[in-house]
Amino acid sequence: SRIRSGECQAPHSSATMKPSLVSSPSPGINIGAVERETGLSKDLLRVWERRYGFPRPARDAGGERLYSPSEVSKLRAIKRLMDVGIRPGKVVHQSLDALHALAGERASDGGAGAVPELVRDVLALVRAHDASALQHLLAQRVMRQGLQPFVLETVAPLTRAVGTAWMRGDLQVFEEHQFTESMHVALRTAINTFPRTPEGSPRVLMTTFPRETHHLGLLMVEALLAPEGAHCISLGTQTPVEDVRRAALAHRADIVALSFSAAYPLRVAIDGLETLRAHLPAQVAIWAGGELTRRVRRTLAGVALISDLAGTIPALRDWKARRGAPPGR
């Protein structure tokens, strides 16, 4: 991360400086680095500054925002709570200790304790930077469980546990990234063992809208659909709505599946879904999944909201039944 030292002082004394300028040599972290460290967009950070009075960055001599390390730690904690469905306005004024306590409660409620030995082993390997051993452990787990149970019973709780450890400061950013990459490899390797889907299989286009950077959720959905005989086409993350439309037509998609984390702006998601629905043929189904969908309080015409990851499997089976497709296709 790029750290700005705040060494540049205005030529006047501190008494004549504007309050917004840095008046001490303590380090500050620029907004781009904070965005990378926390996963919170620059726009969102500015909105919170106006709406909640937090964070309250200092300014360097050039007027650029500089965030303190303690603010970044708190922002990271809030982001992790947002990822499990907590609204930022409810926690933004709580202390870091209180945020950590709440995260611990949510981790327990979310079932991270269901595999305590596995969580302990995985965290130990991540901290030891033993990527090879971690990859082997995950591969063995996939073989023992099967892909769909692995996603629902292992990937989900492990991801929560690693996220909580990162939020508490027990893992560094690069260590969480190492875990995520290892999980990507395990899932992609398992998905690739399934045979090529025959002609007539449901074609599922998968992506996220701009500003949604979470890719693991897409891969988890693909891992649930592949054993059901779906032909999945992933565009990765952050695809503009118009490009989603073009890709759906080009790939002859039967279903467009979009993933939204809890932190994604609700209004932006709804507008994008409604725009996409209006410009795709009626026979192309649109699925919206992820934590954000729990906050949608009204029906979106022509859009299926799937807030529970496990609900992806029956959704595909229902789609097949309505179209008279054979169960394995």
Where on the chain are the PLM-derived regions?
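Long amphipathic alpha-helical segments
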Residues: 37, 41-195
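A detector for short, charged/polar N-terminal pre-domain segments
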Residues: 12-29
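Short alpha-helical "recognition helix" segments of helix-turn-helix
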Residues: 34
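Generic structural marker for isolated residues within well-ordered, non-membrane alpha-helices
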Residues: 31, 45, 273
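Short Gly/charged-rich anion-binding patches and loops
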Residues: 29-30, 43, 76, 220, ...
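C-terminal regulatory/effector modules of DNA-binding transcriptional regulators
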Residues: 5, 170-172, 178-329
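Serine residues within intrinsically disordered or low-complexity segments
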Residues: 1, 5, 13-14
